[in-house]
């Protein structure tokens, strides 16, 4: 499979949450809010700095634990059925970079006020995920000075050199999906040669 974890894109190489299967390809149980908020006059209302923060339906779909757990169960059932039919399931591991929507960074500020989530490293200097990224300036809140894969700020580079916590978390994720109840048969690593620091 191409990446199937929570992500705003169709290709899903800009992973938002490695812990859960995207409810848009899994199961949406709770579906509240609007795609984008509208004023009484019907105009779209957007925070110009963080327009995705206003997509309340998307935020509900991808942060609500009921949707996320249902999607993981859907995937576990799918893998079990694939194995019954003699098929192997290989996941695409995108561990070089994530997406700007990722809960660890949260450049889109969709987790900033979501219940049950820590502040992302873009939002807060005190984020538990700050070491997961290489920041070039000490400017918070909303620090835009971080390393992006090939310079793309929508694909924040993961900082393995300076974060043992990140390495351990990614190892946990890798083990999680090949263990019960998911039992995936293996991983294909995306841009494996780029893992770690890059010159750009």
Task: Explain the meaning of each model-derived region.
Residues 2, 21, 190-192:
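Conserved residues at the C-terminal ends of beta-strands
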Residues 4-181:
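Substrate-binding/active-site clefts of carbohydrate-active enzymes
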Residues 14, 199-200:
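Residues at alpha-helix caps and immediate loop-helix transition turns in enzyme cores, especially N-
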Residues 90, 188-190:
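Conserved beta-strand positions in the central sheet of alpha/beta enzyme cores
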Residues 97, 165, 193-199:
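Acidic-and-aromatic substrate-binding clefts and catalytic sites of carbohydrate-active enzymes
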């Amino acid at each position: 499979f191409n990446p199937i974890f929570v992500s705003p894109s169709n290709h899903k190489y800009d992973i938002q949450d490695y812990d859960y299967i995207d409810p848009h390809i899994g199961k949406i149980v709770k579906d509240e809010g609007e795609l984008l908020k509208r004023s009484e006059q019907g105009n779209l209302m957007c925070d110009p700095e963080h327009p995705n923060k206003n997509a309340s339906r998307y935020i509900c779909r991808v942060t609500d634990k009921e949707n996320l757990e249902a999607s993981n169960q859907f995937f576990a059932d799918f893998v079990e059925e694939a194995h019954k039919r003699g098929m192997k399931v290989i996941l695409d591991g995108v561990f070089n970079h994530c997406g700007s929507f990722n809960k660890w960074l949260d450049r889109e500020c969709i987790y900033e006020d979501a219940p049950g989530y820590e502040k992302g490293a873009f939002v807060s200097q005190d984020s538990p995920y700050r070491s997961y990224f290489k920041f070039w300036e000490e400017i918070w809140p909303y620090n835009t000075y971080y390393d992006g894969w090939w310079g793309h700020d929508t694909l924040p580079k993961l900082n393995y050199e300076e974060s043992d916590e990140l390495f351990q978390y990614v190892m946990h994720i890798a083990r999680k999906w090949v263990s019960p109840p998911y039992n995936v048969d293996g991983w294909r690593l995306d841009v494996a040669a780029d893992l770690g620091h890059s010159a750009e």
